[in-house]
């Protein structure tokens, strides 16, 4: 059975109570997304209002496909609370949470990872985090968080 869409659920547990619980919808094919939204060229997409959302869609789809191609279930969630604090992806593996933020920037700031601390209220352990972005090389923000170029995904 082939799927065209990904339904991403919010991460929740008893300690995190102020969640927005609406699921998110992503497409496996970003080319189809661009066609449906009438973004007809790379230049139009790059300067358009949806460029960040398309990048998030791409990264979510690629991470999910990587898990599925390895025969694993991707335990992928997102976090958004009523104060509009958001984590784009939370990967859960063996009870450990790995937060991922996605930004269409070549120089993401360390302020992006502050929201990761919200997961410390969870009963699950928080581990390494990442900011996936347009920076050309892999680097570290600090000992626990990395900057990952989108081309690595």
Regions found by a protein language model. Give the residues of each.
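Active-site ExK catalytic segment of metal-dependent nucleases
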Residues: 92, 99-107
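Accessory nucleic acid-recognition modules appended to NTPase machines
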Residues: 1-97
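Short conserved micro-motifs at the rims of enzyme active sites and ligand-binding pockets
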Residues: 37-39, 101, 111-112, 141-143
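Domain-level recognition of nuclease-like catalytic cores that cleave nucleotide substrates
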Residues: 135-153
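Active-site-adjacent loop/helix micro-motif of nuclease/hydrolase catalytic cores
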Residues: 106-115
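Conserved beta-strand segments of alpha/beta enzyme cores
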Residues: 75, 128, 144-146
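Short, hydrophobic beta-strand segments that form beta-sheet elements in well-ordered domains
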Residues: 125-133
């Amino acid at each position: 059975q082939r799927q065209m869409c990904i339904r991403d659920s919010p991460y929740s547990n008893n300690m995190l109570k102020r969640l927005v619980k609406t699921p998110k919808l992503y497409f496996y094919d970003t080319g189809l997304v661009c066609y449906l939204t009438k973004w007809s060229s790379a230049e139009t997409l790059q300067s358009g209002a949806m460029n960040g959302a398309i990048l998030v869609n791409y990264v979510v789809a690629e991470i999910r496909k990587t898990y599925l191609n390895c025969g694993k279930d991707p335990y992928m969630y997102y976090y958004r609370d009523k104060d509009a604090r958001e984590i784009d992806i939370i990967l859960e593996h063996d009870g450990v949470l790995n937060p991922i933020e996605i930004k269409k920037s070549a120089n993401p700031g360390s302020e992006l990872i502050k929201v990761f601390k919200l997961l410390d209220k969870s009963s699950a352990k928080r581990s390494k985090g990442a900011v996936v972005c347009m920076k050309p090389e892999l680097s570290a923000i600090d000992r626990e968080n990395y900057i990952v170029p989108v081309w690595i995904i």
